[in-house]
Amino acid sequence: MRLRFILCLPLVMLVGCQSVQTTQGGNVGVNRTQYMMGGLSAEEVNQMADEAYQETLAEAKKQGLLNTNAATVRRLNTIAAELIKEVPHFRADASSWDWEVNLIKDDQLNASCAPGGKILFYSGIIDRLELSDDEIAQIMGHEIAHALREHGREAISRAYVTQMGTQLAGALFGLGEAGNQAAQMAVQYGLTLPNSRSNESEADLIGLELAARAGYNPQAAVSLWQKMQTASQGEPPAFMSTHPSSAGRIQALQAAAPQVQPLYEAAK
């Protein structure tokens, strides 16, 4: 009985969620139905994300690390402008978002696009990997795709219903601490991690198409992840990671490149 309930937790966790389609599928065919918590609006998530983004910028500015390289900032803004022109192919309302692009001087290999279009790059990912414009466009397109698909709101919804599901299991069946941990593990492997990995794969594909439509070479996605693979000191198994492995990512991007190559050729 307990095992049956644990295996059914992904269904229990859909209670209180609404099915949505945040984007069009595009040439790459990203059509997964998403589930969002009914009481959590995109506007609320965007506001929370913007507050966190502005706090990050304020701290970087205080330390003298914000937008210190004017040439790189211009480079990022130019690439962003080209990519943003293409977002209506996936989501029409995104063209009116309050987009913002900033650069923090920091050695980490990182970049992000917060919900609502707040793009942030760290200088380390550009300088240490010696990225071309095409490769920057792949990273930026990937991060923009997370925002278009509202993966942040989806993650918050998953976290909420995961907690709700495990608490319900404990309450109904008197599961002790070990039982609750087992339920959490079932939820994690049955719902949370697969969705997280699929989110990353979706962002790869949508980012690939955005960049191609903007005139950036899709083959740069492969060279980018080859550089990331070289820069990594090892990686967790793909099954346990919220990101696909570099090798798996490269293979998927190589398979998808022919779907967007005509878009790139037309945009050149």
Where are these regions (language model features)?
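Bacterial N-terminal signal peptides
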Residues: 6-15
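A Zn2+-metalloprotease active-site environment signal
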Residues: 2-4, 17-268
